[in-house]
C-alpha cells in the first residue's frame, strides 16, 4: 500500500506501514533518495533484538521431582514410604554351634601321611645395612597359597588316630613364630627363617602366624632398610637431608585388615610410621614422637599389646557387660567352642584346608572413611548398642618402645574382635542362611603386622633373645610374654580341637568303622604319622621319631641351625615312602628305608 504523505513530510512514528530499509539495501536507497529524506520508524522492543550478540538470558531451571522429594518439597505428591522390614538375624552363637559333617573325600593317599613339604624359595634380592653391619638374603615363595577372596588356608596331614575326620591340623617349616607365607601378598619377600620381610613395590603388609587374644604380649622389629641415619646421609650426599631406601610401618592388625595397603589404613590395624614417628589408625596420622625424631635404619621398635580376658571380652560382644561389676581381672576359666568349618583339598602334593575368613563390617568400614569424628550411630565404646563391631575393649592398649625406651601408649580401647564383632565371609549353611557366621575358629585376634614400601625391610623377633628386653610386667602387674610363646600354645589348641572334632564326629556319626584310612600304615617300625599326644611330647618338628629309624643321614645345614631351602629345580613330589624329606629342624635325620611288601589284613591300632 502506498503512503499518502508527501515526500518530505515526516512519517508517523506509530504507523506500521512506514518503510524500513534493511542495511543491505542502504546503498540502493542512497542512490535514489536524498540523505535528508530517509526516516526510520522505531522497531518494537523484542527479546531477539536485545540478544544480537549471542548472549541468552538464564532460564530458571526447576529441580526434578526426585530432587524435590529428597529436599522435603512436594510432600503432597510424594509417594508413601515403604515400610522397612526387619531382617531377622539367623546367626547362631559360636558356643551353640556343632561340627559339620565333613565333605566326602577319597581315602587318604600314602603321601598324605607325610608332613607338608617346605615352601620352595627363589632368591630375589640381598639387603645390606651399614649401620647394623649385616646383610640379609630375601626369597620369593613359589606357588604359595594366599588368604584372599574370603577364604583362609592351612595345612593338613593324614593321621590313623583320627579315623572319622581322617586329617588333623599341621604346618609347614620353619616351625617357630614367624611371618605367615599364606597371610601375605605375593609381592612380599621373606628371609630363610621368615623373620624378615621386604618388597620393592608399593605398600604391602605381612602378618605373623601367631595372634594375641588375651593377656599382654611383646615383639620387636628392627629396621633393615628405611630412612637412613644422619651419619650415612651426610656421607652419601654431603647434605643434612635424610634420604630413604624405602619406608616401613609397624603395628598390629586383625584378619579383616587389607594386606595390599599399609597397616593402620582402616579400623582393623594400629601402626606407627617411620616418618616423624606418627601413629596411624582409620587413615588418620597423629604426631607421637618428639618433633624431629623419626624411625631410622638400625632402630628397634618394641610393640606391646594388652588385651582383657576372653570372659570379659565375651560379655562385651554379647551385650551383657556391666562396668559396675565387671573388672579387668580374669574370671573363672571357661571352655571356648572352637568351630572350624573346613573343606579338605589337594594342592600340588600337599593336603590343605580351606575355611571361611572374616570380612570387614559395614559399620567399621563406614567409620574409617567418615570424616566426622563421631558417626551417626554413636562413637565406639564398650556399650555401643548399634553393632558389636563398634564396641571396644576396656583396659586394652598398645604401647610403643624405641631402642628400649618407652615412648608412650598411643592406642587405647581397641576394637573387640570375638564373634559377632567379627563375622565369617561364607558362614552359610546349605540353605544359604548365615547361621554359622559367628563361628570362632580360635585364630581371630590381633597379629603382629609389618608394612613395607619401595625397598623397606624389617626384621622381627617374636621371642627371646631380645635386642632390648621388654618390661617383666605392666603397670597393673600383668606379666609380659613374648608373642612367640603363642606358637606352642596354638599347637596345643589345634591338637585339642582336632581331638574334640574326632570325638564329636564319633558320637554324631556312630557305628562308623574306625579303620577308614585305607589301612595306610607306615611299614617301617616306629616310623609314621604322629598323633596329637606325640606332637606334644616330641615338639613341633617331631613328625617322625628319629630314635626308631633304621638308618639315618645328617641333614644338610645352611649354618644357621635350619635345614637348607628346597630349590625350585628339585623334585617336589611325594613318590612313596622312600621319598623322605628334611623337616627343617636342626639335626633331624632323613630316613632311607626300602619299602617292604605291604602286609595283608594288617589291623590298625590307635595310638
Swiss-Prot record:
A GO BP entry: regulation of secondary metabolite biosynthetic process
GO MF annotations, alphabetized: transcription cis-regulatory region binding
Listed Low complexity bias regions: 1-19
Biased composition (Basic residues): 57-69
Top-level taxon of origin: Eukaryota
Main localization category: nucleus
InterPro entries xrefs: ASH2, B30.2/SPRY, B30.2/SPRY_sf, ConA-like_dom_sf, SPRY_dom
Coiled-coil portions: none
Renumbered residue ranges of the record's region Disordered: 1-22, 34-86, 587-607
Localization (cell): Nucleus; Chromosome, Telomere
Residue ranges occupied by any B30.2/SPRY domain in the UniProt entry: 157-376
Gene Ontology CC: one annotated term: Set1C/COMPASS complex
UniProt KW keywords: Chromosome, Nucleus, Telomere
Disruption phenotype: Impairs tri- and dimethylation of H3K4. Leads to increased production of several secondary metabolites, including monodictyphenone, emodin and emodin derivatives, as well as two anti-osteoporosis polyketides, F9775A and F9775B.
Family the UniProt entry places it in: Belongs to the cclA family.
Subunit and partners: Component of the COMPASS complex.
Role played: Component of the COMPASS (Set1C) complex that specifically mono-, di- and trimethylates histone H3 to form H3K4me1/2/3, which subsequently plays a role in telomere length maintenance and transcription elongation regulation. Controls the production of several secondary metabolites, including monodictyphenone, emodin and emodin derivatives, as well as two anti-osteoporosis polyketides, F9775A and F9775B.
Name by which UniProt lists this protein: COMPASS component cclA
Higher taxonomy: Eukaryota, Fungi, Dikarya, Ascomycota, Pezizomycotina
Gene from which the chain derives: cclA
Amino acid at each position: 500500500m502506498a503512503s499518502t504523505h508527501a515526500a518530505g513530510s515526516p512519517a508517523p512514528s506509530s504507523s506500521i506501514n512506514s518503510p524500513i530499509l534493511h542495511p543491505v539495501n542502504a546503498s540502493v536507497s542512497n542512490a535514489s533518495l536524498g540523505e535528508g529524506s530517509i526516516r526510520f520508524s522505531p522497531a518494537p522492543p523484542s527479546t531477539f533484538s536485545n540478544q544480537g550478540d549471542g548472549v541468552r538470558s538464564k532460564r530458571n531451571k526447576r529441580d526434578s521431582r526426585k530432587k524435590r522429594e529428597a529436599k522435603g518439597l512436594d510432600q503432597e505428591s510424594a509417594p508413601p514410604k515403604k515400610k522397612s522390614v526387619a531382617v531377622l538375624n539367623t546367626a547362631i552363637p559360636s558356643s551353640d554351634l556343632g561340627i559339620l559333617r565333613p565333605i566326602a573325600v577319597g581315602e587318604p593317599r600314602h603321601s598324605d601321611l607325610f608332613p607338608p613339604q617346605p615352601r620352595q624359595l627363589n632368591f630375589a634380592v640381598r639387603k645390606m645395612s651399614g649401620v647394623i653391619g649385616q646383610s640379609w638374603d630375601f626369597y620369593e615363595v613359589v606357588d604359595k597359597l594366599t588368604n584372599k577372596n574370603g577364604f583362609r588356608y592351612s595345612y593338613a596331614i593324614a593321621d590313623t588316630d583320627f579315623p572319622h575326620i581322617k586329617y588333623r591340623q599341621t604346618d609347614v617349616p620353619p616351625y617357630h613364630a614367624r611371618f605367615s607365607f599364606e597371610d601375605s601378598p605375593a609381592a612380599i619377600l621373606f628371609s630363610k627363617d621368615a623373620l624378615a620381610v621386604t618388597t620393592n613395590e608399593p605398600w604391602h603388609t605381612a602378618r605373623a602366624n601367631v595372634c594375641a587374644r588375651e593377656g599382654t604380649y611383646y615383639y620387636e622389629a628392627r629396621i633393615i632398610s628405611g630412612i637412613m641415619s644422619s651419619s650415612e646421609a651426610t656421607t652419601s650426599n654431603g647434605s643434612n637431608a635424610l634420604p630413604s631406601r624405602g619406608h616401613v610401618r609397624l603395628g598390629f592388625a586383625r584378619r579383616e585388615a587389607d594386606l595390599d595397603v599399609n597397616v593402620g589404613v582402616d579400623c582393623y590395624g594400629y601402626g606407627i610410621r617411620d616418618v616423624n614417628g606418627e601413629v596411624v589408625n582409620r587413615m588418620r596420622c597423629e604426631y607421637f614422637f618428639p618433633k624431629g625424631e623419626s624411625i631410622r635404619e638400625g632402630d628397634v621398635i618394641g610393640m606391646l599389646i594388652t588385651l582383657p580376658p576372653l570372659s570379659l571380652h565375651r560379655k562385651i560382644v554379647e551385650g551383657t557387660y556391666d562396668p559396675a561389676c565387671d573388672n579387668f581381672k580374669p574370671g573363672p576359666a571357661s571352655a571356648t567352642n572352637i568351630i572350624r568349618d573346613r573343606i579338605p583339598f589337594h594342592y600340588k602334593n600337599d593336603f590343605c584346608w580351606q575355611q571361611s575368613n572374616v570380612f570387614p563390617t559395614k559399620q567399621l568400614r563406614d567409620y574409617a572413611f567418615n570424616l566426622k569424628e563421631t558417626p551417626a550411630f554413636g562413637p565406639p565404646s564398650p556399650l555401643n548398642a548399634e553393632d558389636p563391631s563398634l564396641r571396644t575393649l576396656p583396659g586394652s592398649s598398645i604401647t610403643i618402645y624405641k631402642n628400649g625406651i618407652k615412648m608412650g601408649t598411643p592406642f587405647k580401647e581397641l576394637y573387640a574382635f570375638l564373634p559377632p564383632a567379627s563375622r565369617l565371609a561364607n558362614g552359610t549353611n546349605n540353605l544359604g542362611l548365615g547361621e554359622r557366621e559367628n563361628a570362632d575358629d580360635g585364630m581371630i585376634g590381633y597379629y603382629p603386622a609389618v608394612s613395607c614400601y619401595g625397598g623397606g625391610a624389617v626384621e622381627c623377633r617374636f621371642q627371646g633373645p631380645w635386642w632390648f628386653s621388654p618390661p617383666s610386667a605392666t603397670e597393673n602387674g600383668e606379666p609380659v610374654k613374648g608373642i612367640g610363646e603363642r606358637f606352642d600354645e596354638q599347637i596345643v589348641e589345634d591338637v585339642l580341637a582336632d581331638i574334640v572334632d574326632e570325638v564329636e564326629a564319633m558320637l554324631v556319626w556312630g557305628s562308623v568303622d574306625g579303620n577308614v584310612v585305607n589301612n595306610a600304615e607306615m611299614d617301617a617300625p616306629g616310623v609314621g604319622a604322629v598323633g596329637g599326644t606325640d606332637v606334644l611330647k616330641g615338639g613341633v618338628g617331631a613328625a617322625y621319631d628319629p630314635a626308631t629309624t633304621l638308618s639315618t643321614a645328617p641333614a644338610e645345614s645352611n649354618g644357621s641351625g635350619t635345614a637348607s631351602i628346597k630349590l625350585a629345580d628339585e623334585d617336589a613330589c611325594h613318590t612313596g615312602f622312600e621319598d623322605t624329606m628334611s623337616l627343617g629342624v636342626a639335626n633331624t635325620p632323613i630316613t632311607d628305608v626300602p619299602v617292604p611288601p605291604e602286609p595283608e589284613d594288617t589291623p590298625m591300632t590307635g595310638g
